[in-house]
Every structure is written in C-alpha cells, then in structure tokens.
C-alpha cells in the first residue's frame, strides 16, 4: 500500500504565480491562461466535492444521524448540545476511572464525536448570516471613512479660500514688483468701455487687463515665497 498523500492546509506561495505573470510575459502573451472552470467534481483538503453541492450540506447527505428536528431554534439546540457534551465528557471520565477497557468507552467516544459534529454543523449554518453581517459592517466603515475624508477636504478648501481672500484683501495698491519698480494702482478695465486711444482698440484693452493681472499674480507669488 502506497504512502498516504500529504495534503497541505495552506495554498501554494504566491511567488510561484507572480513570476509567471511578469510584464514581459504578459506583453509577449506568455502568461498562463486562466484554468478551465471545473464542471464536475474537485478535491479540497483531501476530500472530493461536487460543484453543485450546497455550501452547507444536510447531515443526512453526509451519512450522519440527525439529533435535532428539522424546525428548531439554533440557540436552544446549541445550549442542549453543550450540556450533552459536558454530561458525556463526565461519563467518559467515570468510565476511564472505573473500567478503562470497557466497550462503553468506545461508545462514549462515538457519542461525543456525534455531538461535536452537530455543534459544528449548527455553527456553520450561521456562516451566511455572518458573511452578510461582515459585509454590511465593512460597507458602513467604508462609507464613514469616505464621508470623513470628504469633510476634511471641504474644511481644507474653506481654509484655503479664506487665506487667499485675506491675502488679496491685504495687498496694497502700490505693491512693488519683484524687479524693484513700483506698480501703480491698477483696476480691471471694462472691455465694453471705449478706449481713449483709437489706435489700441479692443486688443490693447485686453492686453492692459492681462498685464495688470500678471502684476498682481507676481506680487502674490512674492508674498507666498516670503511666508514659506
């Protein structure tokens, strides 16, 4: 008889997959293709499973005797199983003390095994509810984090707008330019008003407004540089 097959409880280290999916392999179409979906059965942890099996299989399909009714209260049944396990464990200790070689020892072991199987089965029936609750909590946490991030962004935006408004309000009209010259008071020119010089026309007025805006931008940059 051959050696029993060793079954690992952990997946293969991911580096064995990563090295196959490098940028060069993907560019040259050398990366392995996704495996074909399994249609019939598969092996997991040394046991064979069918693709159409239920996530939580009934006890009868596994050849295990059912101790609780079909319609029941999970909490009550779990409490009953817990008490039964405790009583059977004490009986097991009594048997080991009085007659360790008795056949009742094996019977009591089977009873304990059946009780533990039922307890794990009832706990596993809570898994879908646990998954939904975990997903709900995770989504609530993500929602709260995004709302807090948006609120922080809004506060920073309001602070920046306030700082810019205060800086603009504190700018003098005759602020010196970076080259040492003094800028005269400039006001945005309304392009709708007629120009005094008929040779400049609308283009000259727009250029004057642009130059005035550039002067203020340069002065603002100088103030910011001094602040930092």
UniProtKB/Swiss-Prot annotation:
Specify where it is mainly localized.
nucleus
Keyword check for Transcription, yes or no: yes
Instruction: Mention one GO molecular function.
Output: transcription coregulator activity
* Pfam families, per database record: Med7
User: One GO term of the cellular component aspect?
Assistant: mediator complex
Q: Which GO terms describe its biological process?
A: regulation of transcription by RNA polymerase II
Q: Where in the cell is it found?
A: Nucleus
On subunit structure and binding partners, the annotation says: Component of the Mediator complex.
Family per similarity comment: Belongs to the Mediator complex subunit 7 family.
In UniProt terms, what function does this protein have? Answer: Component of the Mediator complex, a coactivator involved in the regulated transcription of nearly all RNA polymerase II-dependent genes. Mediator functions as a bridge to convey information from gene-specific regulatory proteins to the basal RNA polymerase II transcription machinery. Mediator is recruited to promoters by direct interactions with regulatory proteins and serves as a scaffold for the assembly of a functional preinitiation complex with RNA polymerase II and the general transcription factors.
The protein's name is Mediator of RNA polymerase II transcription subunit 7-A
